[in-house]
Amino acid sequence: FWTLEPAELQAQLDVNVTSVVQLTRAALPAMIAAASGSIVNVASVAGLVPGRGSTYSASKAYVVAFTEGLAGGLSGTGVRIQALCPGFVHTEFHERAGIEMSSLPKALWLEVDQVVDGCLHDLEAGRVISVPGLQYKVITTVAGMVPRTLITRLNRGLFNARGRT
């Protein structure tokens, strides 16, 4: 965090937060008028269980809180909203970003189809928060049951958080 240029931090916020707010705001009036529509805001498991990237986790937590808050206000309008919180997904994202992921256990990877299927199933079921993949459902559930201090310690030790903020 402290080693990044302010412009890099702002760019992350622009993509992860500002664009979500602006696109949601742009789409809602027509959906509300039609009493129909669905919005899926892409968050991350990192928004539910803070990890190594503090600014990334914080931006995704914003998306989760924003979506949950908006869901209450949309009740009865015919418009559904969801925060999609996937874990690691097999896409070109990490490679393009130059993030080395070879040490990540295979069991933590999700396929794109798993994420899409989970998202659509949860949207149909009326779930505001969608966490695709059994492994991530377990992780987020357990993380919600243990003290935050333990999560912080695990983040420091297991996930080598030092220097990646």
Regions found by a protein language model. Give the residues of each.
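Substrate-binding pocket helix/loop in short-chain dehydrogenase/reductase
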Residues: 1, 5-10
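Active-site helix of classical SDR
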Residues: 24, 59
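A short helix-coil junction within the Rossmann-fold of NAD(P)-dependent oxidoreductases
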Residues: 26-35
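Residue(s) in the substrate-gating loop at a strand-loop-helix junction
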Residues: 44
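Active-site-adjacent segment of SDR/Rossmann-fold oxidoreductases
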Residues: 49, 69-80
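C-terminal helical subdomain
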Residues: 83, 103-139
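Short, flexible catalytic-loop segment of classical short-chain dehydrogenase/reductase
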Residues: 86-96, 100-102
